[in-house]
Amino acid sequence: MAKRILDATASDFEKMDQAALLESIHLAEGRTVCAEVVAISVPLVHAVTNAEMAAAFGADLISLNGYDVLHPMVMGAPGRASLALADLPIPIPADFPLGLGASISDVKRLVGRPVGTKLDCVPPERRDEFGGRVATVDNARRAVELGADFLWLAGNPGTGASTDLIARGVAEVAKAVGDQVIIIAGKMHGAGLGRADVVSEEAIRRYAEAGADIIVVPAPGTVPGATLEYTKDLVEAIHAAGPLAMTGMGTSQEGADVETVRQIAMMSKMTGADILHIGDAGFSGMAPPENIMAFSIAIRGQRHTYRRMALSLRR
């Protein structure tokens, strides 16, 4: 029998395939924390990746945002390539923590947790703008090669990623790599298209039929109109369709005061979601660390939070 993600250690995660990880999340009964961090932001603390910081404050899953699979970079991580700048007398050495060339597997070794990346489902005419961040089959395969445990097909603000584009992207990516990696689908906001194109039961049906393992809906109290009852109905629709459900806090409220974050966490748990996500909109590409910890404590108490924070990577 699979371990609950609450009890899993770094060595446990190394042995899990996508089916085992999904079961581990399911067994935790709504007590899984996913923290999103911007891979290419200057980290909150010098020479420590935001992924490490989020993991240290209680995250079970780390989602990289802004990670380009064609030009990998995770600020704060040891690099695998040198950078030469015209206005510098010497190249910046590879061991300077710019994280040039850092793979997802490199991040996993640093944090001892499952790590995945977002791929944006942008309109075809905008694909060149986003390069290795676009949800294409080739980029998905590259992300898997780089070590991704999950791929989140969604849309960042202003990308124009519609629910239709996400559904199509999920179908293509799931067909190509769905047997190797968890597929997450869904937006936490309009992605530049307004409130009408955030989520619907029809979108949920399409995502599930396309092959999504986890479907995302906005957390209660985030996007306008996302009440507890409304979000609970969407979560029930997701479970009825088969996938796991994740509530997402992607409206910059992850950078609000601790009490607001606690309220959103508790309402999210009341919806019946399997995973509760906290976004990356702090001052430096991640939520304030104390908010991640408060978010975790709210949904599973000090015992499980401190355990996750303290567990050694050597276990």
Language-model region placement:
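N-terminal charge/polar-biased segments
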Residues: 1-28, 43, 281-315
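Surface-exposed amphipathic alpha-helices with a cationic face
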Residues: 18-29, 55, 103-116, 166-178, ...
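Short beta-alpha connecting loops at secondary-structure transitions
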Residues: 249, 279-281
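C-terminal helical cap(s) of enzyme catalytic domains, especially alpha/beta-barrels
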Residues: 74-94, 98, 234, 270, ...
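Active-site-adjacent loop and "lid" segments of alpha/beta metabolic enzymes
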Residues: 48, 128-134, 191-201, 229, ...
